[in-house]
Amino acid sequence: MRPVYLLDSAILIDHLRGIGPATTWLRTLREGEAVISAITRAEVMAGGSSDERAVAFDLCEQFACLALTKESADRAAELRRAHRWKLPDAFQAALAINQDLRLVTRNSRGFDERTHSFVLIPYSVR
């Protein structure tokens, strides 16, 4: 199956923290339907105890990981200038756009679904 979704770190971190809507949404995915970026992988595996990092590693291993390329770097630079996004957000957007994927995030402040058709915000946390 060709991937459809690029998962932002917030989705996986919410799942690891036991946020129900994240887990529910992730369970709807079919095998191969979603991928993560090297940025997501690093962000998810950066924190926590060694036991928590082991769980995070196992979760990340369930998804193919997209590498950063010079094309995505160039697009990220353009997007950062145009939208004043933080660099990791610009890279996520660039990868999603370049790979024709929906960026799944809950970062509605950075990414507005109404403005950016490549964005999917499947739930919110209050």
Features from the language model and the residues they span:
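Alpha-helix capping/helix-boundary segments
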Residues: 11-12, 40, 72, 91-92, ...
